[in-house]
Amino acid sequence: MENPHSILKKVFGYDSFRPGQEEIVSRLLAGQDVLAVMPTGAGKSICYQVPALLLPGITIVVSPLVSLMKDQVGALVQAGVAAAFLNNSLTDNQKALMLRRAREGWYKIIYGAPERLEMPGFQRFAQEKLISMVTVDEAHCISQWGQDFRPSYLRIKEFVETLPKRPVIGAFTATATAHVRDDIRSHLDLHDPYEVITSFDRPNLYFGTRRALPSEKPRVLLDLVLKERDNAGIIYCSTTKQVDETTRLLQSRGIRAAAYHAKLDPETRRKNQDDFLYDRVQIMVATNAFGMGIDKPNVRFVIHYNMPKDLESYYQEAGRAGRDGEPARCTLLYSGTDVRTIRFFIDKEMEADNGLPADVKAEAARKAEERLKYMTFYSTTPRCLRSFLLNYFGETAAPRCGNCSNCRMSEQAAEEMQQQ
């Protein structure tokens, strides 16, 4: 008889669960809702894929990213799991075929964008079949306090309420403050959930901030990259134009770099991603479109060429460094111009015709401004950066870590004082 360990070994090829995974699997199999906040690279997908293969009915995985769905479904199918996805990358004929097969019981796991839950055809299928579990990936998208608020996530609860039998619900995210966790519990109507909040601390990561005028950033960036020699790294930029310019700058110095952003055609994006994953290029220069679901353990540095919009985004992106547990460096370059750029995007979001009421959009903008304020504080604080980050996410931390630019600077100043 199959059990979590036999599925883990047979389907996924692992001998044992990582810390925290097995308890989540057990709770979901026992019918208890779960809210899991686990850092990038902690193996969240195993936590719901294993029970999905042991529960009697079908599991629906709600995911916001087309590329992530494709990658995860591709890996499952390769492992012999009957899985499929439903999103806008499919033609109408492909969607109809997928739904017909779903009604015929072809699939064990179905990934879908939250908007797909509202399709009449999808709702008919869900009401005809036994839906044992609904998994919500990137669950922070349900909260206006989260960094990627998606109004369509708010309708997941309504979808669950239309099902003949309430499924167990698993909500997963890499970063969630107390505000966001409250929203996830409330908006998904989680019933007495088992909660896992893994420590956000990544002791192997060095955190650094550097103030630099826009005209100085290319020089500062080259200094940082050249110190890394042949190490693999990711450079995040806030605009596609900046990605292209930075990629050309690095290539002009003989550095093997590739670009990744939404304006590149899918084939180029896939090729550049594979070149980076298989070490054919040293550096990926990207917008925040790059990284979700990418597991490259040997990334030795992540540089943010521009300040991100909030600490949730920053920590998730910086956390793609050092997944092998070896030392890695995370450096943020910032200037006043970065803040103006982020405010421009916040205003643009306010003006967008996305069907949201004006008061909801105004509240979302207010919360985005609040998150930007903390991001700016992080960029300019003289405090220990690790302590600042951990406190923001609700953890207590030692006042000094000794492994960030501010701690190193104060140590250096103390040494100089002693020598005088």
Question: What feature does the model see in each segment?
Answer:
Residues 2-11, 15-19, 23-45, 52-55, ...:
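Helicase motor core with emphasis on the C-terminal RecA-like subdomain
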Residues 352-420:
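C-terminal accessory/connector segments of nucleic-acid motor ATPases
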